[in-house]
């Protein structure tokens, strides 16, 4: 069971209580602090769309501390980040691994950040399939296509040649915040808001 803190605000009309995530949303902050799956993707996508409808010209801030997760769920978030009119600024706090690092890199150019002790990890897609040989072959082909697509996007967003991305994502590749900046996954290491 997850504990969600509440914030109490004083207004001229009395007190108002918010769960912390709703209060952050008021300031255009979305927090992805767990595995990327269908549920978390639906929540993040809904928040992105809501914030766009509230003010299409004001930046959205997506804070990421995630071990990664589902590719299709992550791609739903990625596509929505690119679709909405406001720039989406990404900030890594703690760890952005796998799909978490992909989403970190998907932030608006010049607005991708990490705190100094953050860790970023990139790798190729994971898959585990069982069944008939023909079905396993279909899934293997699909994961190779996904790998190619993800590597292409990483290459485009980092400015690294596709061959470098392919080599570096062949196995788990861990980077400090400073290394992620040099690599092109983020734009700046920040210490203050």
UniProtKB/Swiss-Prot annotation:
Keyword Hydrolase assigned: yes
SUPFAM superfamilies cross-referenced by the UniProt entry: ClpP/crotonase
Domain of life: Bacteria
EC primary class: hydrolase
Primary role: Cleaves peptides in various proteins in a process that requires ATP hydrolysis. Has a chymotrypsin-like activity. Plays a major role in the degradation of misfolded proteins.
Protein name: ATP-dependent Clp protease proteolytic subunit
Source species: Clostridium acetobutylicum (strain ATCC 824 / DSM 792 / JCM 1419 / IAM 19013 / LMG 5710 / NBRC 13948 / NRRL B-527 / VKM B-1787 / 2291 / W)
GO biological process: protein quality control for misfolded or incompletely synthesized proteins
Name of the encoding gene: clpP
Keyword Cytoplasm recorded: yes
């Amino acid at each position: 069971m997850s504990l969600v803190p509440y914030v109490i605000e004083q207004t001229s009309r009395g007190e108002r209580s918010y769960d912390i995530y709703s209060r952050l949303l008021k300031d255009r902050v979305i927090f992805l602090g767990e595995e990327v799956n269908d549920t978390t993707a639906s929540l993040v996508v809904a928040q992105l769309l809501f914030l766009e409808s509230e003010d299409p010209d004001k930046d959205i801030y997506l804070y990421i501390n995630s071990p990664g997760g589902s590719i299709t769920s992550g791609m739903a978030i990625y596509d929505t980040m690119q679709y909405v009119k406001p720039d989406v600024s990404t900030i890594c706090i703690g760890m952005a691994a796998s799909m978490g690092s992909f989403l970190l890199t998907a932030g608006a150019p010049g607005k991708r950040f990490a705190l100094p002790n953050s860790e970023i990890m990139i790798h190729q897609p994971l898959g585990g399939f069982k069944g008939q040989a023909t079905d396993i072959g279909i899934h293997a082909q699909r994961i190779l296509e996904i790998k190619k697509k993800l590597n292409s996007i990483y290459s485009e967003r980092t400015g690294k040649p596709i061959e470098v991305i392919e080599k570096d994502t062949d196995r788990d590749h861990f980077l400090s915040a400073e290394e992620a900046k040099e690599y092109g996954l983020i734009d700046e290491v920040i210490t203050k808001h």
